[in-house]
A protein has these predicted regions:
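A general "mature secreted/periplasmic domain" signal
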Residues: 21-132
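Bacterial N-terminal signal peptides that target proteins for export
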Residues: 1-8
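Bacterial N-terminal signal peptides
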Residues: 8-17
């Protein structure tokens, strides 16, 4: 019985470790409004964006960082526009969940974008100035 319990705990701990590998790291919400988010760039990190019909989400990169290119898996479901170090997106299709890749002159950013409710929408995601 004791040996079985130890094996079960060992297997469970290994399974738990595997589950966290693909976990999204959530950006930090503003102390004033949870729809305004801040984060640091981390290579290989996927950043979640929750957008809402009729609302624009702004992604702001470090000052001086220039957007070179972008693409998504379901681009017809979204409106995209890049200006300076800002990137704007707005859903056109309520079922338009996809990934988004934005390449700047400094980094490649990976996003998981989903349309959803206004209450959970990301109005703004700002990347703080951090060098890697």
């Amino acid at each position: 019985m004791r040996k079985s319990l130890c094996c079960l705990l060992l297997v469970t701990s290994f399974l738990g470790c595997g589950l966290s590998v693909n976990a999204l790291e959530r950006p930090t919400a503003s102390q004033y409004d949870a729809r305004v988010m801040y984060t640091d760039y981390k290579p290989g990190q996927v950043y979640p964006i929750r957008a809402a019909n009729g609302l624009i989400t702004t992604i702001t990169f470090s000052p001086g960082e220039k957007i070179r290119d972008f693409g998504s898996g379901y681009s017809t479901a979204w409106e995209f526009q890049a200006r300076g170090n800002n990137f704007f997106l707005k859903p056109k299709d309520f079922d338009g969940a996809t990934n988004l890749v934005i390449v700047t002159d400094k980094h490649t950013y990976l996003f998981d974008v989903h349309p959803g409710s206004r209450a959970k929408a990301t109005y703004s995601l700002t990347f703080r100035s951090v060098s890697y």
